[in-house]
Amino acid sequence: MLILSDIPGVNIEDEKSLSKLRRLLSEYRLDQLILIGEVLPKVAAQFDVPSISYSDTAAFLANIRSLSFENATVLLKGGREFHFERISQLLVAKSHDTVLEINLNALENNLNVYRQLLPKQVKLMTMVKAFSYGSGSFEIANLLQFNRVDYLTVAFADEGVDLRGAGIKLPIVVMSPDESSFESIVQYNLEPEIYSFRILFSFLNFLKTKQITSFPIHIKIDTGMHRLGFMPDEVDRLIAVLRAEAVLEVKSAFSHLASAGNEKDREFTQQQIDLLDEFTKRLESGLGYSFLRHIAATSGIELWPNAYFDMVRLGIGLYGIDIERHDLPIREASTLKTNVTQIKYLPASETVGYNRHGVLYRDSKIATIKIGYADGYDRRFGNGVGKMLVNGFLVPTIGDICMDMCMLDVTDVEVGEEDEVIVYPDIKSAAKAIGTIPYELLTSISQRVKRVYFYE
């Protein structure tokens, strides 16, 4: 569902603007369109999407209870004077659920910041694996497709199948293909990463049974990460196999920097870059054709311009988190929010939660909030380790984290039931508190947590 307002300065009745909007709407494959303003409702019949029109935001809000948002992904795009933040707040309040808000303006900003670091000829691959770092695969992939990135990357073939089913047409690389996924890879025009002779021969044999030729693949090279990939001394055998078969076409060869952000490992990182350069030059010479080369992910983009080669891979930096260069105008794109379900006033010596671990040493005000470990809030955040933001103040957890809820000590804060709670005011600090990284916190957010996407 898209909720769209008139855009100041844009004459939507102009055929050029109208045509562009029709194209955008077709790319989003909408089930319903809600139009707000004086101009858009006049051209509603021009869109091949069921629509409802309102004269202004107040009129929409007055009728919001008559609309169903169950199981819907809602995208808001409104001019500032339409104050769509009121709609976002009401949609979240209507559900009284924990939500992950994704700011699409911030995502686009971050994408453009990294693009500006790159020479024009360098292509951009973006990572949408692991539910796009928790942010929602199709919605983020659609934004990236609209912004014309060159490649998308997923971990498993079923993620790529879902994106194809949702209308994503960009090339999609599958990082962890296996024999059971070959059929889907071919059927949905996905491009597998080939990292060993076992997977290479298995895929070759599969393609031969289907009488398929020139199928695109991406060669993974182990330059020092020692996770997946062909070792440098295997290049001659790899060339021999690929030359003997007309079944495969190498679209790229790549590796992964193990420690690009660590100053102490600069020599090791340079060795990895040099190894990729040497391996790929030999591979290109042996095959008799060129392909894309890439090794730099987010940290590499920020710190290693000599590692750009032909393409770079943007992952966590797209979401504005865990970056190495603090001079970049990056914005955090996601905010995990919940609300206060109940407040209790308890005397000193009472205990809170399972196993009575939350001991009160003073008369206290305790807030129960609607997030637990089934939502992806780690149990290690219990008993004061986790800190959340309530009405501008950091407050600690108290007691063990429950499956669907947890408790906060809000004794020193003015707070009421249904007040908003920011779960990770500083996600890097939160990750450090339990000895992990922001990636894990983001990718652990359960899919039962609603995702709310908005443009400012």
Regions found by a protein language model. Name each.
Residues 5-8, 35-41, 79, 130-131, ...:
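Short, ordered loop/turn segments at secondary-structure junctions
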Residues 99-101, 106-108, 122-292, 308:
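Active-site-proximal beta-alpha core segment in soluble small-molecule metabolic enzymes
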Residues 6, 33, 76, 163, ...:
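Residue-level signal for inorganic ion chemistry
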Residues 47-59, 169-170, 189-192, 309-315, ...:
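Active-site regions of enzymes building and remodeling cell-envelope glycoconjugates
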Residues 3-5, 75-77, 127, 218-222, ...:
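Short beta-strand segments
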Residues 1-109, 116, 157:
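ATP-dependent carboxylate-amine ligase
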Residues 101-103, 108-111, 116, 123-126, ...:
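Active-site anion/phosphate-binding pocket segments in diverse small-molecule metabolic enzymes
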Residues 31-38, 53, 74-76, 152-154, ...:
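Short, hydrophobic beta-strand segments that form beta-sheet elements in well-ordered domains
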